[in-house]
Regions:
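Extracytoplasmic/periplasmic substrate-binding proteins
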Residues: 114-116, 121-125, 212, 287-296
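Pocket-lining segment of extracytoplasmic ligand-binding domains
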Residues: 85, 157, 163-167, 173-264
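Functional cleft and adjacent loop/helix regions within the main domain
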Residues: 65, 243, 335
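Secondary-structure end/capping motifs
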Residues: 223-325
Length: 355
């Protein structure tokens, strides 16, 4: 080796060591996604676009909401994106888990479909399907209640949307909870089928029940609070990047989730805010208003500071549907202090759909 080559290597060594030290200093955060769903996948945007450069994000898609909640409660993951309807069960089971923010309400993606020739007045004693203990169960319960039925007035069948297609077409079901593409399959094969309500309905939307949320392990918050704050901020930064670069991010999420891009567009939209028949993406300010840590009224008449009320209403419905036995103090399952800290730090984010 000649002198100049050796000197060059020696000169480069400090930079190499510094680079290795920086890489070694990155802190790992374990994040769970309950199912392959665009609304839950914003941490993949954070990871790919390096929006949290001091952290290594380890993302796991569970395809099993209950399994993911169990992993969060056990401390195997730190953060978990899933539906808000599980929050009362977190309280009931006394696990070390809290709901730290609402993320995005359903904006018409969830429907109740009536079979041909069936009228809402004719449902007593008939079979209706919904996946037990999930959003569809609640939507069916609330809609039946709006039509004057108690849960015991119908015969419940525990079916996911895809599983309900066959029984709907065979005439075994009078009504079913569904979402696309299963709605279209039933409508095309069975003219006369009708959607009687969806989650964009004003009365359904203002309940706040049909919502996705971000959960965190309590010990993670207590022992690594700054990391929790950084991760919460990074999630909203990911949403902001999606708003500004919707086409790019939708293509990214299609590859990540292994979905056709058209399906991604249909769920989260192409305008950087929402998709009718899909979901509505809260910006940070809207989520902070629902938490009650920022002035202003969030959309859909849900009310400022309404998170505990939404959890209580969900709990009451789980009792009506006989999945829970008592109504708990809803505040035990909600921790808006992280959102409050971000507000206090001056963090803000507000955006509308692009034309």
């Amino acid at each position: 080796m000649n002198f100049w080559k050796a000197a060059g290597l020696l000169a480069a060594a400090p930079a190499l060591v510094a680079s290795m030290a920086t890489a070694a200093a990155k802190e790992s955060v374990n994040i769970g996604i309950c199912v392959s769903w665009p609304g839950y996948a914003m941490y993949e945007v954070v990871r790919q676009k390096d929006l949290a450069p001091d952290y290594d994000l380890n993302l796991t898609i569970f395809e099993d909401p209950i399994g993911g909640h169990s992993a969060l409660a056990a401390g195997q993951i730190d953060i978990y994106a899933c539906t808000a309807d599980y929050t009362p069960l977190v309280i009931d089971r006394g696990t070390d888990v809290v709901n730290v923010s609402f993320l995005n309400p359903s904006f018409g993606v969830d429907h109740i479909i009536l079979a041909p020739g069936v009228d809402a007045a004719d449902l007593k004693g008939k079979k209706v399907s919904a996946p037990q203990a999930y959003i569809g169960h609640l939507l069916m319960g609330l809609w039946l209640d709006s039509q004057g039925y108690a849960p015991g007035d119908v015969e419940w069948v525990n079916l996911n949307a895809d599983e309900a297609v066959g029984p709907m077409l065979s005439g075994d079901l009078a009504a079913a909870y569904m979402y696309e593409p299963w709605i279209s399959k039933v409508m095309e094969a069975q003219p006369g089928s009708a959607s009687v309500v969806d989650t964009a309905n004003a009365d359904m939307a203002k309940t706040g029940i049909f919502m996705d949320s971000l959960y965190m392990n309590k010990n993670f918050i207590e022992e690594r609070r700054q990391v929790a704050l950084d991760m919460l901020r990074a999630r909203w930064d990911g949403v902001g990047y999606w708003h500004e670069n919707t086409e790019e991010v939708n293509a990214m999420l299609a590859e990540y989730l292994q979905w056709p891009k058209g399906d991604i567009d249909a769920v989260i939209g192409t305008n950087g805010k929402n998709a009718e028949g899909g979901i509505y993406m809260y910006d940070f300010d809207e989520a902070a208003q629902v938490c009650g840590v920022l002035d202003g009224e969030p959309p859909f008449d849900i009310g400022n500071g309404s998170m505990p009320n939404v959890v209580k209403l969900t709990n009451e419905w789980w009792v009506k549907l006989e999945l829970m036995k008592q109504v708990h103090d809803s505040a035990a399952g909600v921790d808006c202090s992280l959102m409050g800290d971000l507000v206090a730090s001056g963090y803000r984010q507000s955006f509308a759909a692009r034309p």
